[in-house]
């Protein structure tokens, strides 16, 4: 099943990634500040091309899989960030979200605005019961994004992951479908095709 694109918010266009995004994708994932708290990167151009090819999948994921989205500011026509949504568990109707944005576009609320749309997709379009986000505990801006969405911090794991040569703490945030509906009002309708 595929989502019909684009999705739009007040200021953003959320669309499928494509091989044409390679220059912007490389710029994002080669920036040490962008990848500081990610499990991977920075990437050289060939690694960025390979990474983008794996992320340019249109089908919604099965359990354990992820789908990635490109984000543009309306009227600008360039990739300014990427969103990700993982299908964690069918049994528990659990999805996870993630996001990466160009630092030149930081502080404008784009990460929260775009992520809100994919959280809405998980709940209204895909029937999620729970949506979560995980992050390096040092990544305060990322924590603020999830807090703006109404997610609560549910866990702080101490040195639970060994990433890029160091033990790191991880925070887990989450929100349930009834909580989301209370915050956001009526469900959004999404269009899908087979």
Model features per residue range: what roles?
Residues 1-104, 121, 125, 159-160, ...:
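GNAT-family acyltransferases
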Residues 125-134:
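Conserved GNAT acetyl-CoA-binding A-motif
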Residues 130, 158-159:
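Short, Lys/Arg-enriched C-terminal cap helix and immediately downstream tail that follows
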Residues 147-157:
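Conserved acetyl-CoA-binding loop of GNAT-fold acetyltransferases
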């Amino acid at each position: 099943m595929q989502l019909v694109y684009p999705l739009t918010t007040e200021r953003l266009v959320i669309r499928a990634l494509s091989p044409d995004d390679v220059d912007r994708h490389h710029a994002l994932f080669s920036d040490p500040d962008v990848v500081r708290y990610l499990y991977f990167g920075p990437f050289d151009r060939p690694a960025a091309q390979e990474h983008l090819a794996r992320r340019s999948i249109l089908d919604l994921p099965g359990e354990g899989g992820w789908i990635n989205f490109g984000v543009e500011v309306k009227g600008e026509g360039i990739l300014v960030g990427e969103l990700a949504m993982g299908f964690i568990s069918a049994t528990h109707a659990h999805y996870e979200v993630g996001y990466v944005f160009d630092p030149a576009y930081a502080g404008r609320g784009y990460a929260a605005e775009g992520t809100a749309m994919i959280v809405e997709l998980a709940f209204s379009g895909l029937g999620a019961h729970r949506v979560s986000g995980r992050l390096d505990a040092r990544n305060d801006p990322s924590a603020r994004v999830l807090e703006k969405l109404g997610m609560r911090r549910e866990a702080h794991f101490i040195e639970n992951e060994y990433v890029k040569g160091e033990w790191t703490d991880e925070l887990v945030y989450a929100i349930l479908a009834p909580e989301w509906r209370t915050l956001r009002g009526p469900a959004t309708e999404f269009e899908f095709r087979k």
